[in-house]
C-alpha cells in the first residue's frame, strides 16, 4: 500500500464515529453487532481506489463486478439474523469477506461460499491477516448451499434470489433463521425467515434493498 493510500485510509477512519452514530440512528442497536462493525477495519476490504471512502455508509465496487455492502445493510442483516455465540452460520457470497468477518465476531463458526475464485482467494488472505480461525471457505455454487455441513443455525445470503431460497431453507435447523434479499428486479425485498420448529417459516419483510443477483454455478476464469 502506498503512503498516499495509507494517508487516505487514516483520514477516512476519522469518519468512524459518524458512521457508528448513523447506524444507531437507523436502528442498528445490537451491542455485539455494533462492536463487530466498529472493530473491523473496513479499509482492509476496499480497493485502493476507494480507500478514502472506506468508512462511508455506502456500497463500494470490488473485483469481478461485485460490491462490498453498505455498512447499514451489513448491520441490519447481521442484527436480523439474531446470531448467538454458539451459532454455526452459513454465508452465501463471501465477496470481499467484510460481512464474513462481522459474522465471525458474533458466532462460533462461519461457513462461507463464493463463486468467484479471485474473490475467494483475496478474502482468504484478509482472513489470514486478521487472524480469523473460525471461518471455513468453499469455492462453489452458493445457491446449492453446503449440505455436508448442514443443518445450520443461521444462514445469510448476500446476493438476490429470484424467489424463496428453498434449497437453503432446507439446510436450516427447525428453529433457524435465514436472511436474504429476494426479487427479480433491480430492487428486492430483504426477508427474514424464522423456522417455527415444525418445518414452516414465519416470513418478515424488512426493507427494500439492491443486491447483485444470486447466480448458478461458478464463475469461469475469474
Swiss-Prot record:
Keywords: Cytoplasm, Methyltransferase, S-adenosyl-L-methionine, Transferase. It catalyses: [protein]-L-isoaspartate + S-adenosyl-L-methionine = [protein]-L-isoaspartate alpha-methyl ester + S-adenosyl-L-homocysteine. GO terms for molecular function: protein-L-isoaspartate (D-aspartate) O-methyltransferase activity. Transmembrane segments: none annotated. GO terms for biological process: methylation; protein modification process; protein repair. Pfam families: PCMT. Its main location: cytoplasm. One of its GO terms (cellular component) is cytoplasm. PROSITE patterns: PCMT. Its EC number is 2.1.1.77. The keyword S-adenosyl-L-methionine applies. The active site is at residue 69. It is found in: Cytoplasm. Belongs to the methyltransferase superfamily. L-isoaspartyl/D-aspartyl protein methyltransferase family. PANTHER family: PROTEIN-L-ISOASPARTATE O-METHYLTRANSFERASE, PROTEIN-L-ISOASPARTATE(D-ASPARTATE) O-METHYLTRANSFERASE. NCBIfam families: pimt, PRK00312.1. Catalyzes the methyl esterification of L-isoaspartyl residues in peptides and proteins that result from spontaneous decomposition of normal L-aspartyl and L-asparaginyl residues. It plays a role in the repair and/or degradation of damaged proteins. This is Protein-L-isoaspartate O-methyltransferase. It comes from Caulobacter vibrioides (strain NA1000 / CB15N) (Caulobacter crescentus).
Amino acid at each position: 500500500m502506498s503512503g498516499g493510500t495509507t494517508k487516505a485510509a487514516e483520514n477516512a477512519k476519522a469518519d468512524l464515529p459518524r458512521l457508528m452514530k448513523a447506524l444507531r440512528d437507523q436502528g442498528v442497536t445490537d451491542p455485539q453487532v455494533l462492536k463487530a462493525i466498529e472493530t473491523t477495519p473496513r479499509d482492509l476490504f476496499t480497493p485502493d481506489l476507494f480507500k478514502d471512502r472506506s468508512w462511508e455508509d455506502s456500497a463500494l465496487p470490488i473485483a469481478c463486478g461485485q460490491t462490498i455492502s453498505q455498512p447499514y445493510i451489513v448491520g441490519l442483516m447481521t442484527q436480523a439474523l439474531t446470531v448467538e455465540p454458539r451459532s454455526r452460520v452459513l454465508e452465501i457470497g463471501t465477496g470481499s469477506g467484510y460481512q464474513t468477518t462481522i459474522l465471525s465476531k458474533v458466532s462460533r463458526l462461519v461457513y462461507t461460499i463464493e463463486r468467484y475464485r479471485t474473490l475467494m482467494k483475496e478474502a482468504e488472505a484478509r482472513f489470514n491477516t486478521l487472524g480469523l480461525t473460525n471461518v471455513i471457505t468453499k469455492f462453489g455454487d452458493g445457491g446449492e448451499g453446503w449440505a455436508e455441513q448442514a443443518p445450520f443455525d443461521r444462514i445469510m445470503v448476500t446476493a438476490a434470489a429470484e424467489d424463496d431460497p428453498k434449497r437453503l431453507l432446507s439446510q436450516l435447523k427447525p428453529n433457524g433463521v435465514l436472511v436474504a434479499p429476494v426479487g427479480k428486479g433491480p430492487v428486492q425485498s430483504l426477508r427474514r425467515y424464522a423456522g417455527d420448529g415444525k418445518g414452516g417459516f414465519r416470513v418478515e419483510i424488512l426493507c427494500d434493498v439492491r443486491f447483485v443477483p444470486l447466480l448458478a454455478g461458478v464463475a469461469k476464469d475469474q
